[in-house]
Amino acid sequence: MKQFLDFLPLVVFFAFYKLYDIYAATTALIVATAVVLIYSWVRYRKVEKMALITFVLVAVFGGLTIFFHNDEFIKWKVTVIYALFAGALLFSQWVMKKPLIQRMLGKELSLPQQVWSRLNLAWAVFFILCGLANIYIAFWLPQNIWVNFKVFGLTALTLVFTLLSGIYIYRHMPQDDHH
């Protein structure tokens, strides 16, 4: 259910883009993200930090897009979010000395420190590359291609990278944890 809720604003954005335009889609994205955030609070009495950060960025960049009637703001939001994610991962590893991935999954999984570090770094690089790809596609290709990339391309890339991360984790788990 949670994954569906996380994906819902993206579906709404895509539908409104196809039916109307980027500005209606951006407005719908802001509203849908707010509704999901409110629903999460009412249903679970908890809002995840990433969801809150995402909402703030959607509201700010989306609001600027609508106010200035300029789609460049909403296009930059994707790269800014990925840059923040990558920055948080790298900061946790290099400054806090405990990878963020380990902080998030360490209670459920027992992995060697080197594996946590590699996984954390891999996700940081993934987010950086996705952010760079977004810049290229958003500003060098037609808007409809960017919308499709944002909705389907980045989602597919994230699912594939999550699967690859799962395989990597499984290969490095202590033998007792495999069963």
Swiss-Prot record:
Pfam families: IspA. One of its GO terms (cellular component) is plasma membrane. The chain crosses the membrane at residues 22-42, 50-70, 76-96, 121-141, 149-169. It is a multi-pass membrane protein. Its main location: membrane. Plays a role in cell envelope biogenesis, maintenance of cell envelope integrity and membrane homeostasis. This is Inner membrane-spanning protein YciB.
